[in-house]
Amino acid sequence: AEVRRLASWFNDKFFAEASGPLVNERFYKRHMRIEQGGGPPDTDAIRAARVNVRYHLAYIGWLVSTRDWLAGDSMSFADLAAAAHLSAVDYLGDVPWAEDEAAKAWYARVKSRPSFRPLLSEWLAGVPASRTYVDLDF
């Protein structure tokens, strides 16, 4: 139940509050026509999403300070869901890793796994990745 709860948290709540708005405003809108919702980024939406990232990062930090992985003693779909959303935000350079060492250490463990590395080789056209995105020891 905890795996499903946390996977839903990141796939629904984190996406709606953080990763979705950041990727939409900073990437998708520049490739969309005005009638499709394209145009300049909404800086208020970006600012709000960045604030929300901080709250979610603190939650991840709290979870992994009380358990080995997000949902318990072993890596699960919850870790993969959270890390996938965080990787999109990290790509854009919008994760304040210095604010939560426990969350940072957890993410470093996830992205160091061979099964996660293919995700880190994906690039967005015209948008360079942040310094921490591919660095396993950031």
Label the model's feature ranges.
Residues A18, S121-E122:
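Short loop/turn and capping residues at structural boundaries
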Residues A7, N11:
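Glycine-rich, aromatic-flanked loop segments that form ligand/cofactor-binding clefts
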Residues W123-F138:
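Acidic/histidine-enriched, glycine/proline-rich intrinsically disordered or flexible terminal extensions
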Residues A1-L6:
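Alpha-helical secondary-structure segments
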Residues D12-K111:
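GST-like fold's C-terminal all-alpha helical module
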Residues Q36-P40, L119-L120, F138:
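Short, structured secondary-structure boundary patches
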